[in-house]
UniProtKB/Swiss-Prot annotation:
UniProt keyword terms in alphabetical order: Behavior, Cell membrane, Glycoprotein, Membrane, Olfaction, Receptor, Sensory transduction, Transducer, Transmembrane, Transmembrane helix
Family as reported in the entry's similarity comment: Belongs to the insect chemoreceptor superfamily. Heteromeric odorant receptor channel (TC 1.A.69) family. Orco subfamily.
Organism: Harpegnathos saltator
Protein name in the entry: Odorant receptor coreceptor
Residue span of region Disordered: 261-280
Keyword Cell membrane: yes
Keyword Acyltransferase: no
Summary of the knockout phenotype: Impaired behavior and decreased reproductive performance, probably due to loss of pheromone sensing. Ants show strongly decreased sensitivity to various pure semiochemicals delivered in puffs of air, and display increased levels of wandering outside of the nest. In a solitary environment, homozygous mutants also display an abnormal antennal twitching behavior: they quickly move their antennae, similar to the quick antennal movement observed during dueling among workers in the transition to gamergates.
Glycan attachment positions: 167
Gene Ontology biological process terms from the UniProt entry: antennal development; detection of chemical stimulus involved in sensory perception of smell; detection of pheromone; mating behavior; olfactory behavior; response to pheromone; signal transduction; social behavior
Entry membrane topology: Multi-pass membrane protein
Extracellular domain ranges by topology: 65-73, 155-190, 372-383, 477-479
Transmembrane spans: 44-64, 74-94, 134-154, 191-211, 351-371, 384-404, 456-476
Length: 479
């Protein structure tokens, strides 16, 4: 069967999509062929059933051990910790159309021949960073699952029962497993112990990866948007220099049209002037069909005798009408690309905003209980290692999307600074108007909100960290 060639963000994020498919997310698009789609649906349903089964068994164990406050707190933290994964698997399955729409939003971006090199460079940078992010988070997740498993065998778990009548303490040995869980059979020895160990390792690994793969997808979208904003800031200066040719006689102005980036413009300043190319041989005789979204903008024909001729060109700058049109089209390219980025960020917020709200609600409760658990640490042991591991991992999840949300805010607001810093005063009147509009539009930063309740930024991370530290200090004082 013929393989389907992916494009846009789907092609860029294909490794992430494959990870999501392999670990049980309900991604039923983007197959190389349709033969495996049915099998993948069966796998996703079976995987979700196994994950929900172990989650329910842990909940039953929580109810059984609810008499002891410390056991109740520890079991609650475990359930809340893995609630992220269950929520995100179901959330993606229910709202998958929003994710597909976001993946497809960059399938047909506008382009411009003068800035193709800059666009390709920043796209390559974004692609490299997205792959690196996926690798780092994936490696951290696998190492966390391995560390969880190894830590299990450092200490034999026990449970203390206190008789309310005689006040006698009875110690019960528990199965040496990754999770405290109820099973209707003896899982402490024999083949059943091995089977349960394998099942729990599979459960921990899949749950961690299912949650983090969706977080990495969210961060990759924001990373891509930030690099596109970098691209727009980088071409602002050459855009103004190109625009200056429309109003002012510039010697060798045809050199400006060879610039694909600001670096090229700076490199060409000290070069000897090239000979004027014959009419019709200029590199500006390019296909402009991808610059505009409609044909009315570029299908207009110009009379060859229109305007004043100057050195074989049209107008006092020595530019042909087609060259002037190319300069003006560069401004429209910038505006349309910025609108495209805004649409991408809006789609990301629609797809993932409510999941962020659920994540922060669960994390707040988890960190509150972990602060209580931290007051019980009295030495270097398995309890201390597991508590510290929970805290670092939970804060790491919040920091991951907060750092990228904060960068989006910074990059979107710095566009205004880049527009003002370029030589807009040497540009054409329409370029000056363009800079004024850019400064007005970019005063409000692009951002991602958690269903309108909070903005994803480092301020959010700082507030969560500060609240947890304050609560911990209060508990220490009360203790």
């Amino acid at each position: 069967m013929m393989k389907m060639k992916q494009q846009g963000l789907v092609a860029d994020l294909l490794p992430n999509i494959r990870v999501m498919k392999f670990f049980g997310h309900f991604v039923f698009n983007y197959y190389d062929d349709n033969s495996s789609k049915y099998l993948h649906k069966i796998f996703c349903c079976v995987n979700l059933f196994l994950l929900l089964l172990q989650f329910a068994l842990c909940a039953v164990n929580l109810i059984i051990e609810s008499a002891d406050v410390d056991d109740l707190t520890a079991n609650t933290i475990t359930l809340l910790f893995f609630t992220h994964s269950i929520v995100k698997i179901i959330y993606f399955a229910v709202r998958s159309k929003y994710f597909y729409r976001t993946w497809a939003i960059w399938n047909n971006p506008n382009s411009h021949p003068l800035f193709a090199e800059s666009n390709a460079r920043y796209h390559a940078i974004a692609l490299k960073k997205m792959r690196l992010l996926l690798f780092l988070v994936g490696a951290t997740t696998v190492l966390s699952a391995i560390a969880w498993t190894v830590l299990t065998f450092f200490e034999h778990p026990i449970r203390k029962l206190v008789d309310p009548v005689t006040n006698e303490t009875t110690i019960i040995e528990l199965p040496q497993l990754l999770l405290r869980s109820y099973y209707p059979f003896d899982a402490s020895k024999g083949i059943m112990h091995v089977i349960v160990l394998i099942y729990q390792f599979y459960w921990v690994l899949f749950m961690l990866i299912d949650a983090n793969s969706l977080d990495v997808l969210f961060c990759s979208w924001l990373l891509f948007a930030c690099e596109q904003l970098q691209h727009l800031k980088q071409i602002m200066k050459p855009l103004m220099e190109l625009s200056a040719t429309l109003d002012t006689v510039v010697p060798n102005s045809s050199e400006l049209f060879k610039a694909g980036s600001a670096e090229h413009l700076r490199e060409s300043e000290n070069q000897p002037p090239p000979p004027v190319p014959p009419q019709g041989d200029s590199m500006l005789d390019l296909d402009l069909r991808n610059i505009y979204s409609n044909r009315q903008d570029f299908t207009a024909t110009f009379r060859p005798t229109a305007g004043m001729t100057f050195n074989g060109g049209v107008g006092p700058n020595g530019l042909t009408k087609k060259q002037e049109m190319l300069v003006r089209s560069a401004i429209k390219y910038w505006v349309e690309r910025h609108k495209h980025i805004v649409r991408l960020v809006t789609a990301v917020g629609d797809a993932y905003g409510f999941a962020l709200l659920l994540h922060m609600l669960t994390t707040t409760i988890t960190l509150t209980l972990l602060a209580y658990q931290a007051t019980k640490v009295n030495g270097v042991n398995v309890y201390a290692a597991s508590t510290i591991g929970y805290i670092i991992y939970t804060f790491g999840q919040v920091f991951l999307f907060c750092i990228f949300g904060n960068r989006l805010i910074e990059e979107s607001t710095s566009v205004m600074e880049a527009a003002y810093s370029c030589h807009w005063y040497d540009g054409s009147e329409e370029a000056k108007t363009f800079v004024q509009i850019v400064c007005q539009q970019c005063q409000k930063a692009m951002s991602i909100s958690g269903a309108k309740f909070f903005t994803v930024s480092l301020d959010l991370f700082a507030s969560v960290l500060g609240a947890v530290v304050t609560y911990f200090m209060v508990l220490v004082q009360l203790k």
